[in-house]
Amino acid sequence: MVDRWEKRGSEPLHDYGFLRLRKDRYRHPNLEGERDFLVIDALNWVNVVAVTPDQDIVLIRQFRYGVGDTRWEIPAGVIEPGEPAIDAAVRELREETGYAGDPPEPLCEVEPNPAIQSNLCTSYLIRNATLQHPTEWDENEVIEVVLKSQQEVRQMITSGEFSHALLQLPLLHFLTGIGPAASGGESAR
C-alpha cells in the first residue's frame, strides 16, 4: 500500500494569469526530510465533440505555439471563473466554430497531468450541431472549421495526424461508445 504524503506548506511562485505556479512542500512517513514539488494551477477546461445531423464531426485546425505548427482539434477552451462546465462547452463551440446543437451530454472528465497540474478537463458531446452563429475568436485565434466523417476522424487518430492526446480521448469515447453519453449516465464528478 502506498502511504499518503503529508502536505507541509505551499508557496505561490508566479501568476501568469491563465495559470499559476506554486511550490508545495510534502513529507512522506517512510522517507527522511521534506520534499518540494512544483505544481501548475491552470484553469479547468472543456472539450466538445460536436456531431452534425449527418453524423460528421466538427473539427478545427489552428496554429499551436507550443509545437510551432498547426494541429487538428475539437473545440475546447477554459472554463471562466464561476461558469458551469456545461455552459462553457456551449460557449466554446459557438465562439470557435459558430455551431450550436442539442444540450451537451457528458463524455468524460479527466485530470490532464496530476503529477504537476491541479486542473480538470471535462468533455461533452453535442449532437445535431449546425452552423448558427458567426464565430467569436479570441484575439490570438485564427481557426479553420472542417467537417470530417467519423471514419476519417478514426483514420486521423490512427495515423497520428490528429495528435492532441487530451482531445483524442473524448473522440475515442464517442467513437467507441464508452462513457456516460453512451450509457446515459452522469459525469464521475
Q: For the regions a protein language model found, what residue spans apply to each?
A:
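Nudix hydrolase/Nudix homology domain
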Residues: V2-W5, T70, P81, P106, ...
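Acidic, metal-coordinating catalytic segment for phosphate/diphosphate chemistry
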Residues: S10-V49, P53
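Acidic/glycine-rich phosphate/pyrophosphate-binding loops and surrounding catalytic core
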Residues: A100-N113
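Active-site-adjacent beta-strand/loop module that shapes the phosphate/pyrophosphate-binding cleft
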Residues: R22-N30, N113-Q132
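Beta-rich strand-turn-strand
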Residues: G82-D87, E96-P103
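Short, well-ordered beta-strand micro-motif
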Residues: K23-R25, A50, L125-R127, L147-S149, ...
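Conserved Nudix-box catalytic region and its N-terminal flanking loop in Nudix hydrolases
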Residues: V2-R4, F37-A42, N47-R91, A129, ...
